Amino acid sequence: MQEKKYGLFTTITMITGIVIGSGIFFKSDDILQYTNGNMLLGIAVFLIAAIAIIFGCLTIAQLAGRSDATGGVIGYAEEFVGRKAAGALGWFQVIFYFGTLVPVVAWVSGIYACQLFQIESTLDNQMMIGFVIMTLFFAMNMLSGAVGGYFQNASMIIKLIPLLLFAVIGMIYGKPGAVISHDIESIKSTGVSAGWLTAFAPIAFSYDGWIVAVSIGHKIKNSKRNLPIALIISPLVILACYILYFVGITSLLGTDTVMAQGNDSVFLAATQIFGHIGGKLILIFVIISVLGTLNGLILGFIQL
């Protein structure tokens, strides 16, 4: 009988930790550009985009509640559809999904590592560092899945710190109510063009990766109960974090400043809060966020 290693909390951090990567830190300006600086429409974009992950999770939760098959969605496909469908899905996941996502996320970790340690940011250096990091995480998870689970829990908690910090400080020292009131009046007076719908493009990838968590279903304690619960709770946690961070940083800096500063807006906000070390702190949090995503992907990959 296989040892059950992961509890409900690890399962939730697996889903949220993979989905919440580094991208959310740098998406606020893109969304505001597409919505013409309207924060309320930006919130609507997050809500509508979350429909896919929420109902996707609810759908898979129904299968998870009926099966504890190994291999995640591949096991579900074999049990509820057939071996051919499971085989096709398995090859797709190995070659096109994990086979591309894992190296790309590892490379991104190499990019941020070069920035943090002031290493010459050449493609060779980025890829070499990313390869070393990827190899270390594969070794860690293959030698001890429990250690991988602990890292997933820790990285998820750590990456939430700056998101919630910006949210709280923005709510306190910014004026989100005034911004939303202004946005409502703007919509009433000028209307809304269809152009704001293009804001879905920059955040589409910000909701990806949740399906990986079902790969560890056979290692989850009482998986028929805990996995469906995690699949229901996690998308709501992700949505709440995204909206709170977006509202917080936009209220703190102002929509015009966020759009003008672009990706540097998060570093500007961090500098206002923490002083000259703010930029370094944010970079550390971003790297931890990427490593949490990478660890979750690898943890799910080796359980296929």
Regions picked out by a protein language model, each given a short descriptive name:
Residues 29-31, 79, 196-226, 230, ...:
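Helix-loop junctions at the membrane interface of multi-pass solute transporters
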Residues 157-187, 204-206, 246-253:
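Hydrophobic alpha-helical segments and their helix-loop junctions in multi-pass secondary transporters
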Residues 38-45, 154-158, 214-250:
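Junctions where cytoplasmic loops transition into the N-terminal start of transmembrane alpha-helices
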Residues 5-15, 82-97, 129-133, 190-201, ...:
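Select transmembrane alpha-helical segments in multipass membrane proteins
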Residues 1-40, 53-58, 70, 184:
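Membrane-interface "cap" regions at the ends of multi-pass membrane proteins
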Residues 75-78, 82, 115-119, 232-295:
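TM-loop-TM module centered on a large, flexible mid-protein loop between adjacent transmembrane helices
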Residues 30, 54-134, 139-142, 147, ...:
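Hydrophobic transmembrane alpha-helices that form the core helical bundles
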Residues 126-176, 231-235:
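Membrane-interface loop-to-helix entry segments
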